[in-house]
Amino acid sequence: MEKALRLLPLASRLFSLLGMIVLIGLMPWLSGRDPALSLLRARSGEQEATPEALNAIRQQYGLDDGPLLLLGRWFHGVLRGDAGNSWISGRPVLEGMLQATGVSLTLMGYALAVAVVVAILLALPTLWRGLHGENRRPAGVLAVSLTALPEFLLAALLLIVGAVWLQWFPPYGWQSLQHAILPALALGLPAGGLLALLLNDGLAATFSERWLLTWNLAGIARRHCLLAVLRRTLPALLPQVGLVLIGLTGGAIAVEKVFAIPGLGRATLGAAIAQDLPALQCGILILLLLAFGTGFLMQGAHYLLLGRIAAALPNSTPPQHSSRASYIFAAVAALLLCLLVLSGIIRDPFSSLHIRLQPPSLDLPFGADATGRDILARVAYGALNTSLLALAVSFASLSLGIVFGLMPRLMCGIIELANATPPIVAGLLVTAVTGPSPFGAACAVMLVSWAPLSAHCASLLAEARTQPYIRMLPVLGIGRCRTLTHYLLPALWVPLLRHAMLRLPGIALALAALGFLGLGPQPPSAEWGLVLAEGMPYIERAPWGVLAPAVALVLLAVLAVTLANTAGNRRR
């Protein structure tokens, strides 16, 4: 029995990976639509779907053989390097996707270089203070500010400033190194801010350990102390660095769309919108392989550097600092968002009552969009719609997190799979099944948002079961079911609910990202990401159409990151 329990996590990981492969392979049938009809519509939206045309497509692609047989053929073809032919062009999809992957990997390499430089620069003050005996975890205002900017939003802002206003960089394309600067900054700056927060935490924790005080009293040179501190800190950060790199795979999709880069993310997004399922299958499979491969390499490097002593190393806690500034930032951001909603909620977000692309004025504070609609009203209603949808996703994620958190060994594979899947990649999967819609976007974000809550639930459950009064319950004749419902769950509910509410702004940002990419609500809906996307084609003539939703998203992002940072300090 004990041996079977030890093998349960491995079996969970294998079945989760197998389930993901089956899900990708069965995508043409999961939507409930006739695959032949989907293929016909992907090729030509005007051709009449006659029985003869549909039968010809079924015979050409062997669709009458059924999903299971075609799943086996698809998987066998993937193993042989044949991912099928595009439903639109009829050409093999693998070669084009591999070329696009090369472009995306190049962009991610540039972004990683930017992130490393930013993280080092922001961590230098912590290193300097620690080596000189002043050890405190910095507030990290600049790092928090960088982390607060989602990649798709930062890409739009950089496009406005660097390409439109200053005209220092080309706005679109991938022809030279100059074309890579703005996209690399859009991807690298948020990742660098997050790495800086992690590195500062790790360094502050290492500087608080007693062995370093002993070294200082022994007169060991500072350069040797510096090398020892880095050797102690960096290996423990590798798993977190892996999660940052996984995040780059999702962020690259939005950045490639903004700057028209012919990368894997843009190609996969185009396949999802066009319902070119063979290309979408291949793109998602490569994206997931990149994410899983990155996580596996980081975990492997962590084990190689530390070996069996990894589990024996103490988990140091960085010294706490006053988070008054974080509370002020969060309060100001929340207040400005409330003022924005209250000032625009009384306006009409759908009527085209104004001049097309009318500039801002006293009567029209944020101007009008390309169809003459009030942007302030659309941003205010977008805040309301996005927040309500994010609230529903948060409660659904909380419910799933509790259910799966009660079975940590059985669900460890699914939890790791959800953690390794960016929300945008999940959005591509769901869009292939349901099509672009608010419900599909909510499902996509929910499918990856429950995993941190589940891990938190499992940790709280293990801690609660060690309490003496819980261990005495079986002696008193109280069964497992009553123990769970009357003692364990009430102890878990409050901290998990607080955790879920702290994740609410981040979920809203994920929903906005899917809306920006065209995977969420469709026009004429008032949704933040959609409003931002509608203003992008007119960014040179009417930049206020992008700046207005961008400012609202920046406020939401600042609120999300400062709340998470403050909560992290409080838990320590």
Regions found by a protein language model. Name each.
Residues M1-L5, G25, W87-R91, G109-V144, ...:
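Transmembrane-helix boundary motif in ABC transporter permease subunits
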Residues F15-L23, R223-V255, L384-L400, C481-A513:
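Transmembrane alpha-helices
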Residues L17-G66, Q167-H179, L342-A370, Q522:
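Hydrophobic alpha-helical transmembrane segments of membrane transport/permease proteins
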Residues I21-L39, Q240-L269, L428-L429, V433, ...:
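Non-cytoplasmic
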Residues L63-I120, D369-A370, D374:
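An internal, D/E-rich "acidic patch" concept
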Residues Y110, A139-G193, P365, M411-A455, ...:
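Generic hydrophobic transmembrane alpha-helix motif, especially the helices
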Residues S176-N216, P436-T485, P495-L504:
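Membrane-cytosol interface at the C-terminal ends of specific transmembrane alpha-helices
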Residues Q281-S322, P408, V445-V448, L502, ...:
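C-terminal transmembrane helix and the adjacent membrane-cytosol boundary/short C-terminal tail
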